[in-house]
């Protein structure tokens, strides 16, 4: 008697993503899955793009203890980001589960995004034990080498985790949902319009917030 293979979480009926109805409605499919969900994720990405360097420079004072790091991390991470995007593409080419091809990666990407954001914006300030020493360290630039190394690791790991793995895992997978969800051309147009509206809305809000605090 052949042994039963253990099913993964994404093979359970709970994660079944196949749409049994013949039509795709504006709500909840398009409204929640293609408009509200993406606009929140894109807004999060926009905030990171706008505020990350300002956070490094103005909040944790990276310019005082590692001025080269603000330039080196994005440049050195370019290759890792390319590899991460290729890896996500390969994962999407695998045999689909009951949850489909894209949904497992979207669900995995969300907690990884949360972890990456924590690493990006909760970086230990070198040599800082309280508010007074944080301020003194930022003013004088007198920081410990050990603290600077730890902060550098946080910044580098958080940056690569977000841009090379977490964000491609969510965004690349979600971008493929339109073609994977339905074969109806008119319904694809509806879903594509919802995604475009989400992109424009998130870009507009993020841009206004960035300009308001420049």
What are these regions (language model features)?
Residues 2-211:
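Membrane-embedded alpha-helical bundles of multi-pass transporters/translocases
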């Amino acid at each position: 008697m052949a042994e039963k293979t253990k099913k993964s979480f994404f093979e359970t009926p709970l994660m079944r993503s196949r749409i049994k109805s013949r039509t795709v409605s504006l709500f909840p499919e398009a409204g929640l899955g293609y408009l509200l969900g993406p606009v929140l994720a894109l807004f999060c990405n926009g905030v990171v793009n706008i505020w990350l360097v300002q956070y490094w420079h103005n909040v944790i004072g990276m310019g005082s203890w590692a001025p080269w790091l603000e330039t080196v991390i994005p440049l050195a991470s370019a290759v890792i980001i390319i590899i991460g995007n290729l890896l996500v593409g390969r994962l999407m080419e695998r045999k689909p589960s009951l949850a489909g091809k894209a949904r497992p990666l979207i669900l995995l990407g969300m907690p990884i995004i949360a972890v990456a954001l924590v690493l990006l914006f909760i970086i230990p300030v070198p040599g800082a034990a309280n508010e007074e020493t944080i301020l003194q360290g930022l003013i004088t630039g007198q920081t410990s080498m050990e603290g600077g190394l730890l902060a550098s690791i946080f910044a580098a790991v958080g940056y690569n985790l977000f841009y090379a793995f977490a964000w491609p895992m969510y965004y690349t997978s979600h971008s493929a949902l339109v073609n994977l969800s339905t074969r109806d051309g008119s319904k694809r147009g509806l879903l594509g319009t919802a995604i475009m509206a989400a992109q424009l809305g998130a870009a507009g809000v993020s841009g206004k917030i960035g300009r308001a605090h420049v």
